[in-house]
A protein has these predicted regions:
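Hydrophobic/aromatic-rich core segments of domains that either
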Residues: 73, 113-194
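Short helix/strand-bridging catalytic loops that position acidic/His residues to coordinate divalent metals
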Residues: 98-101, 132-138, 326
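Low-complexity, disordered linker/stalk regions enriched in Pro/Thr/Ser/Gly
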Residues: 242-359
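Cleaved targeting-peptide boundary
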Residues: 16-20, 158
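Sec-dependent N-terminal signal peptides
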Residues: 3-13
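Catalytic cores of secreted or luminal carbohydrate-active enzymes
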Residues: 195-281
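Secondary-structure boundary elements
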Residues: 19-107, 113
């Protein structure tokens, strides 16, 4: 977190200026590890939103994490998963949503691709997570699992969500990201992590490791597709690499799937990232730079916001209004309080950044 509390000329005005407690704003981390994102202007997204009435699924809910839970639950309820029968080859989101109520041998790949499209359609920044425990022996939990991570503006963090099981993991009531689940697995086997399910986030009993996606050990190893525009480009393959967080554990161990070394090693398809912040980049969060020039504060805004519509500013108790990437505010006394935020094409607002400007 960083503080933006800006005063000029205090030496001659300390008696007239009432200094408030420091302002803590969300930390900005740019996107340097991932490539393309879904394009909300693509016709397929309009079809998805309208045909399946996604607005109805989140009607009246303004908290974005609760919206995510509602959309996850909606998808989980819509797709009828049957354990028997032929595997369904087409993993396109629209076909899963269309045929899902009829039932079929759907699994994590279908659900993660569909949830990625549903969340994206409603403006949430999301990505597919591919994971596994990575063990060579025993092999009872040695395959892979597909789920999703979504950036939550209200929590200002990434959260791992699983549509197949309508669940996610929490520690002390805080939803965890994929890397945070992995941290707990490597630390002590995730003893203090709970899997919670449904809209009411009810804790679930611990299950055996062979229950895919229902155990934290599923996330001992994690990768993310580097290209995030699968739905926009369908049926084209978005290509790209598998982003792998290369910490000390990843450098000194090998990821196994089904008893064999992960295919991406020999194929040269791992994009190894040693900087954790590059993986846990901060969508929608602002990077604000300020400079005092004479009687004005010059403000410059940047961000890594997919599908950015505009930046907005709110002065004091006024209304939100559009803000340019660069603008100036004349210095006043008492201090000028300013809120800034990003807004994407779906109308979702990013975390607010607060400035207190004064002479």
């Amino acid at each position: 977190m960083k503080t933006i509390l800006l005063f000029a000329g205090l030496a001659g005005a300390l008696g007239a200026v009432q200094v408030e407690p420091p302002v803590k704003n969300p930390a900005f981390r740019p996107n340097t590890a991932f490539g393309s994102h879904e394009d909300l202007r693509a016709p397929r997204f309009e079809e998805l939103r309208v045909k399946y009435r996604l607005e109805e699924a989140v009607k009246g809910e303004t908290d974005d994490f609760k919206r995510v839970l509602l959309l996850r639950h909606w998808l989980h309820a819509r797709v009828v998963v049957e354990k028997k029968g032929p595997e369904l080859p087409d993993k396109d989101a629209l076909s899963t949503l269309e045929e899902g109520p009829k039932g079929g041998r759907y699994h994590c790949a279908h659900l993660s691709v569909a949830l990625n499209a549903v969340l994206s359609a409603m403006g949430h920044v999301t990505r597919i997570v591919l994971s596994g425990p990575g063990e060579k022996e025993p092999a009872r939990l040695s395959g892979s699992h597909g789920s999703n991570e979504v950036w939550c503006n209200s929590l200002c963090k990434w959260v791992l969500v699983d549509a197949e099981h309508d669940s996610h993991f929490e520690k002390d009531g805080v939803p965890l990201s994929a890397l945070e689940v992995r941290d707990e697995v490597l630390r002590d086997g995730a003893k203090s992590v709970a899997r919670v399910r449904g809209l009411d986030r009810r804790p679930e009993a611990r299950v055996e490791d062979e229950s895919w996606g229902q155990t934290a050990r599923t996330y001992g190893w994690i990768s993310w597709p580097s290209e995030g525009n699968r739905f926009t480009r369908y049926p084209e393959d978005p290509g790209g690499f598998q982003v792998l967080y290369e910490d000390e554990y990843a450098r000194t161990h090998t990821w196994y799937r089904d008893g064999r070394k992960h295919w991406a090693y020999d194929a040269g398809r791992f994009k190894r990232i040693s900087e954790r912040g590059a993986i846990e980049w901060t969508p929608n969060v602002l990077d604000v730079k300020t400079r005092l020039q004479g009687e004005e504060w010059e403000v410059q805004i940047a961000s890594s916001t997919p599908n950015l519509k505009e930046y907005q500013m709110k002065k004091g108790d006024g209304a939100w209004e559009r803000a340019e990437e660069k603008f100036a505010i004349r210095v006043k006394a008492p201090p000028e309080k300013v809120l800034l935020r990003s807004v994407n094409l779906a109308g979702l607002c990013g975390p607010e950044q607060r400035l207190v400007l004064a002479r």
